[in-house]
Amino acid sequence: MPTININKVDLERLSNISLSDKMIEDRFPMMGVEVEEIFEEVDKNGKKQNMVQFSINPDRPDYLSVEGLARGFRGFMGINTGIQEFEVLNSNIKVTVEENKTRPYVAFALVKNVLMDELVLESMINLQEKLHWAIGRDRKKLAIGIHDFDKVKAPFTYKEIRGDEIKFVPLGYEDEEMTPREIIEKHEKGIKYAHLIQDDKFPVIVDLNGEVLSMPPIINGTLTKVTPTSKNLLIDITGTEKEAVEETLNIIVCALAERRGTIVSVDVNGKKYPDLTPKSRMISVESINKKLGLNLNPGEIIQAVKKSGMDALYEDGNLIVKIPAYRNDILHNVDLKEEIAINYGYEKFEGKLPSVATTGSKDSVEKKCSAMSDLMIGLGFYEVMNLTLSNQDTLFEKMNLEVEEKDYIEVLKPASIEHRVLRTSILPLLLETLYINKHHSLPQKIFEIGDCVIIDENDTETDTKCKNIKKIAGAITHPLTNFNEIKSSTGALLREFFEDFEFENYEHPAFIPGRCAKIIKDRKEVGFFGEIHPEVILNFELEHPIVGFEITIE
């Protein structure tokens, strides 16, 4: 889970409450936020500061700043309950978006008269970086730019340019102008995120005079650098997924509004941002009590809803719940039930002993998986853990596989275009992991043990006709890797955990012909290994040879 370090005085100031260490340690965990450490540190002026380190659940990105965390705590403690309304003032600021295939979605907002100081600036920068990881997937899905609005002139243009078309001074360089191509070759951030630029097309945001605000997702310009004296902040979010871009903008502007900032709209190709209109969901009182094992009346439930920063109206056995725009974690009614449980008070729930005595033990398959993990680590591999949800592009298209829709399970209403399909294989996700880590040194040896989900029409035990299959997969990349290296690692694993296996030549679209073998046990195929085809390597935007294997455990 991501962690954030928060100045205790700043937290008290925003929470409108004096906080003892005991209160912090007792109350924050009850609202789902773990307290890792309370400590002292010396700031750059030599003064001691009381700090608190919190662990934040990934589903609460609005808690990744002191502003959002304090807002949630005020509600939890009953200081300010109900939905917090944020007024958005109209403006004539416009942004023209020209065609941009690399990062097609963009949203802007202006927050004026922010009460800025060193603490606020530090909090804002930390929130920006945490959101880059939590939602932006290290800027792959989205990137955030925050600018001193007073340094530029509207209107603005978001467009793609060639690598040598313009020059500007990037953040971190005081007076050295560079072209976009020079930035990705020389600048620290440019080198780190150069893999996000495609086909020598560089997205830029420029103002009326052609001054460069930003080259997303790489770097901002020095011209609009935010300082403790800045007060009017222009925020831009660019990315590959519209919903994530808009939700991230809402989180940031609402955090800055906690610093007395005034939110001002920006017209982006005819659409006004930000849109802070609350969402709504209907949920029955009966279903809430059934899930929580309680017998709460509507008034008690509404009180808990209001403490969570939402509003609710009771109507014919149901609650109509208003959800603020900065809450992107309320996807289903079960999420509302969790919020009600938290704000009713976990300490009020009573545990019940089961009527039948049972003795637990570790599942035999899990024991085997644990032993496999130890062996792979002993062979020099690093273990990774990916989500079971993926997408058709990663699982099939990049692997050169032709698969019909009936052969995999697709999510009806996915929260993200990257998480639309339940994975049927682990190896493609390992290649994606190598892509994410391509800027690290070689060799890289990774493995994963996890569930894949397949359709089984002959399954008579469930109504879904689906079942989980436990698999293990591994991948190695470096300039000299070859078939023998992956055969050696796979063989060591098989000799330890499988008996009476044999290899046969195998033609697999993702592997080089003649350099792939399938693993046979009891006359059934249980896995394969070999050298990844160069076309697949390029599909994942990788550069060095890769070998890999995948074996079905159960």
Curated annotation (Swiss-Prot):
Matching InterPro entries, A to Z? aa-tRNA-synth_II/BPL/LPL, B3/B4_tRNA-bd, DNA-bd_dom_put_sf, Phe-tRNA-ligase_IIc_bsu, Phe-tRNA-synth_IIc_bsu_arc_euk, Phe-tRNA_synthase-like_B3/B4, Phe_tRNA_ligase_beta2_arc, PheRS_beta_core
**Residue stretches in coiled coil:** none
Q: Cross-referenced CDD domains, in alphabetical order?
A: PheRS_beta_core
List positions binding Mg(2+). D329, D335, E338, E339
Give the GO biological process terms: phenylalanyl-tRNA aminoacylation
Catalyzes what?
tRNA(Phe) + L-phenylalanine + ATP = L-phenylalanyl-tRNA(Phe) + AMP + diphosphate + H(+)
Q: What does the record give as cofactor?
A: Mg(2+)
Molecular function terms in GO for this entry?
A: ATP binding; magnesium ion binding; phenylalanine-tRNA ligase activity; RNA binding
Q: Which family does this protein fall into?
A: Belongs to the phenylalanyl-tRNA synthetase beta subunit family. Type 2 subfamily.
**Name of the protein:** Phenylalanine--tRNA ligase beta subunit
- Protein's organism: Methanococcus maripaludis (strain C6 / ATCC BAA-1332)
Q: What is the lineage of its organism?
A: Archaea, Methanobacteriati, Methanobacteriota, Methanomada group, Methanococci
